[in-house]
């Protein structure tokens, strides 16, 4: 089981991420047995990524300083064959974000793009009403557009929501399950992106490893929601569920 594999391998995941979710991401990776490092200064990111198993680039609180660090770290990771994950948070909310994501996609070869449907719309230029960094409203053919995006950038595209869609441009599938409480707190999607980095780097079949990751992340959400109905406790419950899954495997899925 992929979460157990992550615990066994203990990959170091370099996260250049946003300050809203950095603590939650770090604790989520630790819950699975991975090691997080959140370095984002341009003076050290190339050195730091060189000792990591994967790099996460998350643009949630984007600024010029972290933009430079993202480009440096991403290019270095490409040189070293280290997988890079992109979380284009709120990509369609502003021109600055959209232009930055385009630059990142042009200059860096990403292994995975993990987004919601509003962010997917921004990446493929489909009209969409973005609501800040949240998904917003509109219509998009997720299967078609995600597949074309995966083919264009030669990567795996994961579009998360009530149901998750994943494709590498050839094979694809939907993953169901989860719980709506995950949308009522910040950071659950951002944490998933970090976990995708840990999963991608923990075996020889990244596609299958990511399918399993999405499946068991939804199982973790179900376990967490079964533990509490109080929204203030859901993040803690999710961390506990991830920890249990990484130690006990599928046995812990029995509610």
From Swiss-Prot:
Superkingdom field: Bacteria
Catalytic activity annotation: 5-(2-hydroxyethyl)-4-methylthiazole + ATP = 4-methyl-5-(2-phosphooxyethyl)-thiazole + ADP + H(+)
Keyword annotations from UniProtKB, A to Z: ATP-binding, Kinase, Magnesium, Metal-binding, Nucleotide-binding, Thiamine biosynthesis, Transferase
GO BP, sorted A to Z: thiamine biosynthetic process; thiamine diphosphate biosynthetic process
Pfam families: HK (PF02110)
EC number: 2.7.1.50
Residues at which ATP binds: 114, 160
The protein's required cofactors: Mg(2+)
Biological or metabolic pathway of the protein: Cofactor biosynthesis; thiamine diphosphate biosynthesis; 4-methyl-5-(2-phosphoethyl)-thiazole from 5-(2-hydroxyethyl)-4-methylthiazole: step 1/1
Gene Ontology molecular function terms on file: ATP binding; hydroxyethylthiazole kinase activity; magnesium ion binding
Chain sites annotated for binding substrate: 38, 187
Family: Belongs to the Thz kinase family.
NCBIfam families, alphabetized: PRK09355.1, thiM
Role description: Catalyzes the phosphorylation of the hydroxyl group of 4-methyl-5-beta-hydroxyethylthiazole (THZ).
Protein name: Hydroxyethylthiazole kinase
Name of the coding gene: thiM
């Amino acid at each position: 089981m992929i979460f157990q594999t992550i615990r066994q391998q203990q990959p170091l995941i370099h996260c250049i991420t946003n300050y809203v979710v950095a603590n939650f991401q770090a604790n989520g990776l630790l819950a699975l047995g991975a090691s997080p490092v959140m370095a984002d200064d341009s003076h050290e990111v190339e050195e730091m990524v060189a000792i990591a198993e994967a790099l996460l680039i998350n643009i949630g609180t984007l600024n010029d300083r972290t933009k430079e660090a993202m480009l440096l770290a991403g290019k270095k990771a490409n040189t070293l064959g280290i997988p890079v994950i992109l979380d284009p948070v709120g990509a369609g909310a502003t021109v600055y974000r959209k232009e930055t994501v385009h630059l990142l996609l042009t200059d860096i070869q990403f292994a995975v793009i993990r987004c919601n449907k509003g962010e997917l719309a921004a990446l493929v230029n489909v009209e969409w009403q973005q609501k800040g960094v949240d998904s917003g409203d509109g219509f998009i053919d997720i299967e078609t557009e995600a597949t074309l995006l995966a083919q264009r950038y030669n990567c795996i595209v994961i579009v998360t929501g009530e149901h998750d869609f994943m494709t590498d441009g050839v094979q694809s599938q939907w993953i169901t399950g989860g719980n709506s409480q995950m949308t009522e707190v910040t950071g659950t999607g951002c944490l998933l992106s970090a976990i995708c980095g840990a999963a991608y780097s923990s075996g020889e079949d990244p596609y299958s490893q990511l399918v399993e990751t999405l499946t068991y992340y939804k199982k973790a959400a179900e376990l967490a929601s079964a533990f509490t109905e109080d929204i203030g406790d859901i993040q803690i419950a999710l961390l506990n569920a991830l920890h249990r899954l990484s130690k006990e495997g599928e046995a812990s899925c029995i509610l």
